């Protein structure tokens, strides 16, 4: 992966985390440590249904394969 690919993926994840944090701030604890994101204390089961199904590259985000 080159730098551009990492930036695109990073921005995508950041937007998703911020968006989700605004929806579930009272329900979830989101801790970011280095490259790993840990979401805990969620009362909303939809979170665990959505996360495994997320495919960043299916939403019009095209990253050339290296």
UniProtKB/Swiss-Prot annotation:
- Lipid biosynthesis found in the keyword field: no
Instruction: Kindly report the protein's main subcellular placement as a broad class.
Output: host cell
Q: Which domain of life is it from?
A: Viruses
Q: Does the keyword GTP-binding apply?
A: no
User: What's any GO biological process attached to this entry?
Assistant: transport of virus in host, cell to cell
**What does the further note read?**
TGBp1, TGBp2 and TGBp3 seem to act together for cell-to-cell propagation. TGBp1 is the main movement protein that physically cross the plasmodesma with the viral genome. TGBp2 and TGBp3 would facilitate TGBp1 function.
Similarity remark:
Belongs to the Tymovirales TGBp3 protein family.
**Which protein are we looking at?**
Movement protein TGBp3
Which source organism? Answer: White clover mosaic virus (strain O) (WCMV)
């Amino acid at each position: 992966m080159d730098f551009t690919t990492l930036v695109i993926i990073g921005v995508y994840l950041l937007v998703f985390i911020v968006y989700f944090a605004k929806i579930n701030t009272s329900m979830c604890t989101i801790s970011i440590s280095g490259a790993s994101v840990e979401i805990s204390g969620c009362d909303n089961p939809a979170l665990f249904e959505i996360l495994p199904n997320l495919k960043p590259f299916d939403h019009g985000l095209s990253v050339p394969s290296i």
